Regions:
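Long, non-catalytic terminal segments
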Residues: 1-51
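Domain-level detector of nuclease and nuclease-like folds
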Residues: 33-36, 43-181
Length: 181
């Protein structure tokens, strides 16, 4: 299992010139290895939305039909969210859960792969603290890498936890883990 210390050690050992651009490969390897250790039948694909104008990439498990991480350089989005499309996305997790965004629309998230069952009080509570910080960084044009990783405890599409992280230049980390139950 990855911890805040794992990320801090990776960041501390980085010796390049552009941590935001160059650390992604190491992070993807860590995320894939961590997920595969608990899900040996995983069939992971990378869904890179940069060609469509987004700055985000998603790792998705085809076998269990779930996103395992969303990451990228956040952008300050000013266009309105397509609430009709979001309303059409299934919400089978119960009344206490929202169709939560891994990456908030206001910082570049917006596709169906980005929606996931998220406890309502988390979605409008503690999860927003780091989202707001990232939105402000995006508004300022700060170059950072933002990631959100749903952590699953079984084969369902319901995450047990969410891990949020922001890697900033030169070598710093903002980090939080949230319970989703």
């Amino acid at each position: 299992m990855l911890t805040e210390g794992t990320y801090r050690n990776l960041i501390a050992s980085y010796r390049g010139k552009n941590i935001v651009a160059e650390l992604t490969g190491s992070l993807v390897a860590l995320w894939c290895d961590d997920y595969a250790a608990a899900n040996p039948t995983a069939d992971l694909v990378s869904v890179d939305l940069r060609e469509s104008g987004s700055t985000l990439t998603y790792l998705f498990d085809i076998h269990l039909q779930r996103t395992i991480v969303a990451y990228g350089v956040p952008v300050f989005a000013t266009n309105p969210r397509d609430s009709g499309r979001m309303a059409g996305h299934p919400n089978s997790a119960g009344q206490d859960y929202h169709r939560g965004h891994l990456i908030a629309h206001s910082i570049g998230g917006g596709t169906d792969i980005n929606l996931i069952p998220q406890l309502g009080k988390l979605n409008i509570g503690h999860f927003r603290i780091l989202e707001k910080r990232v939105r402000e960084l995006a508004r300022q044009g700060s170059n950072c890498l933002y990631f959100v990783r749903p952590i699953y405890s079984n084969a369902s599409q319901m995450p047990a936890q969410f891990e949020q992280g922001v890697i900033l230049r030169p070598k710093s980390l903002l980090y939080a883990v949230h319970q989703n139950s």
